[in-house]
Amino acid sequence: VHWTETERATIETVYQKLHLDEVGREALTRLFIVYPWTTRYFKSFGDLSSSKAIASNPKVTEHGLKVMNKLTEAIHNLDHIKDLFHKLSEKHFHELHVDPQNFKLLSKCLIIVLATKLGKQLTPDVQATWEKLLSVVVAALSREYH
């Protein structure tokens, strides 16, 4: 994947504005509420039976931060995303048996959360750049499935 200097700068500028724990929690909360079947992979999280339970669940916050920390690694290693996610792809395929469609759903939720945080700053160009970033991450996470 080729990244222009403008794309790299756009990713970094947006990233600097994010509170990772908050964005991660909100994206995962949105995933679980909008696509409730995705919770089946998170039985160890306890109560995910309602919007309120999901939003206040500390394990959702913890895992959301874990997701965002991995995304941080990707942002700081844009030219090596495929390698960076290799082991995680293996784990999600071989051990966790996660449907790779869920990665796409989470990326959609993340874009929506970015829109709520950035408002008018999420211009079409900014969105396109972040959609590109997340599609590269999703492809890397889904790689083991092919």
Curated annotation (Swiss-Prot):
PANTHER family: HEMOGLOBIN FAMILY MEMBER, HEMOGLOBIN SUBUNIT EPSILON. Involved in oxygen transport from the lung to the various peripheral tissues. The lineage of its organism: Eukaryota, Metazoa, Chordata, Craniata, Vertebrata. Red blood cells. Heterotetramer of two alpha chains and two beta chains (an easy dimerization is also reported). Keywords: Heme, Iron, Metal-binding, Oxygen transport, Transport. Heme b binds at H63, H92. It holds the Pfam family Globin. This is Hemoglobin subunit beta. One of its GO terms (biological process) is hydrogen peroxide catabolic process. Residues 2-146 form the Globin domain. Transmembrane segments: none annotated. Belongs to the globin family. One of its GO terms (molecular function) is heme binding. GO terms for cellular component: blood microparticle; haptoglobin-hemoglobin complex; hemoglobin complex.
